[in-house]
């Protein structure tokens, strides 16, 4: 009697979801279940391809029960079961994203307020600059109330669902289009293909969800007017769309889009470049299979790449803030040069410290939430969110 255990439907679907949502280094799903031992051997690379807040090597728990001798030719899971599993993963991933984003929302709002305070001062919505993260928290709670720290979070949570759906739609297409392999085509072709596919997929997804990011930014920076008893500029998410379309048209919702696409490529280039260079040097010997070492390295590299590309984020958000204003930046280059000329280079990094705190808070919450899911459901559903 054949003692080989064949994978269950759920295990096959878990393998498909894992392959479709991780690094370009993994092959696309071709309809057959491949030996999980292959992926376990390659687990050291690509664990942080989506974000530092995702649990590294989280997906391997679902494949651990499948023996490495599993048959390479198996009957595919029925479509309805596959969709059901996908829907559960998608929705639970949304809950996970909502939990982490909501927990870190106060830090995120403070980051955006500090980052865009100079534009707010120009428009009369801020009387004086913030002295730091603590001062921003204190003044925001005093002037607007504790609940205002979550202003703009709804748009940020909503943004997760179309982003993930679009990522599933675009990622495999561009992965096949730029199908370079490191061992076959060499490092630089693989690296260039990784940048191209990631940038193209990111820009394609961004085209559909950018207006939500714009609305989130405007709501988060909508502090009450500096004058006593001042009112807010926007009454909610729908009001942002209505007023922006009335004053600037569709272009107002997409101000800063071009530089955002550049930012995706710059970030991915820095991230994969640093990770691929540092991992073989630092994670050696006993450190190679260390969860903690992998997590710390991924977190440090993610924050390093985010810090290096932070000026691009500042420029795009400062451009967003000019929608509805009489005076606007002519282009991202004009915005960059004006900020440097009038405010100095330090202004491009305002709020960067909050970014690091946000990553810590999000990672801590997700770690706890993952543990809760293991207890309740027996598996983890990652947020995958950007």
UniProtKB/Swiss-Prot annotation:
Keywords: Antiport, Membrane, Mitochondrion, Mitochondrion inner membrane, Repeat, Transit peptide, Transmembrane, Transmembrane helix, Transport. It is found in: Mitochondrion inner membrane. GO terms for biological process: mitochondrial ADP transmembrane transport; mitochondrial ATP transmembrane transport. It holds the Pfam family Mito_carr. The keyword tRNA processing does not apply. Disulfide bonds: none annotated. It is a multi-pass membrane protein. Monomer. The transmembrane helices are not perpendicular to the plane of the membrane, but cross the membrane at an angle. At least 2 of the odd-numbered transmembrane helices exhibit a sharp kink, due to the presence of a conserved proline residue. ADP:ATP antiporter that mediates import of ADP into the mitochondrial matrix for ATP synthesis, and export of ATP out to fuel the cell. Cycles between the cytoplasmic-open state (c-state) and the matrix-open state (m-state): operates by the alternating access mechanism with a single substrate-binding site intermittently exposed to either the cytosolic (c-state) or matrix (m-state) side of the inner mitochondrial membrane. This is ADP,ATP carrier protein 1, mitochondrial. It comes from Gossypium hirsutum (Upland cotton).
């Amino acid at each position: 009697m054949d003692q080989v255990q064949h994978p269950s439907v759920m295990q096959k679907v878990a393998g498909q979801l894992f392959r479709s949502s991780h690094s370009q280094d993994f092959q696309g799903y071709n309809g057959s279940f491949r030996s999980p031992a292959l992926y376990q051997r390659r687990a050291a690379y690509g664990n942080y391809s989506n974000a530092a807040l995702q649990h590294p090597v989280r997906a391997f728990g679902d494949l651990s029960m499948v023996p490495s001798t599993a048959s390479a030719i198996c009957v595919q899971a029925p479509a309805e079961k596959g969709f059901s599993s996908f829907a559960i993963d998608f929705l639970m991933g949304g809950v996970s994203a909502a939990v982490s984003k909501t927990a870190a929302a106060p830090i995120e709002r403070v980051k955006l307020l500090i980052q865009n305070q100079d534009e707010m001062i120009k428009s009369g919505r801020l009387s004086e600059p913030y002295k730091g993260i603590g001062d921003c928290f204190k003044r925001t709670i005093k002037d607007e109330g504790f609940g205002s720290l979550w202003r703009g979070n709804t748009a940020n949570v909503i943004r997760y669902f179309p982003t993930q759906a679009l990522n599933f739609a675009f990622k495999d297409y561009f992965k096949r289009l730029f199908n370079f392999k490191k061992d076959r085509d060499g490092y630089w072709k693989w690296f260039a293909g990784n940048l191209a596919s990631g940038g193209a997929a990111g820009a394609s997804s961004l085209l559909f969800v950018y207006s939500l990011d714009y609305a989130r930014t405007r709501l988060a920076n909508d502090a009450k007017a500096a004058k006593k008893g001042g009112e807010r500029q926007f009454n909610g998410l729908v009001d942002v769309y209505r007023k922006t379309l009335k004053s600037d048209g569709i272009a107002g919702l997409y101000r800063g889009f071009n530089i955002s696409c550049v930012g995706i490529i710059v970030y991915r280039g820095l991230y994969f470049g640093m990770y691929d260079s540092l991992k073989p040097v630092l994670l050696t010997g006993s450190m190679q299979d260390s969860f903690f070492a992998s997590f710390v390295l991924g977190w440090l590299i993610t924050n390093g790449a985010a810090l290096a590309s932070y000026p691009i984020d500042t420029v795009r958000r400062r451009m967003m803030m000019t929608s509805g204003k009489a005076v606007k930046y002519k282009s991202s280059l004009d915005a960059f040069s004006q900020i440097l000329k009038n405010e100095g280079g330090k202004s491009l990094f305002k709020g960067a410290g909050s970014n690091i705190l946000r990553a810590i808070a999000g990672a801590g919450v997700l770690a706890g939430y993952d543990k809760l899911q293991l207890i309740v459901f027996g598996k983890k559903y990652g947020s995958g969110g950007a």
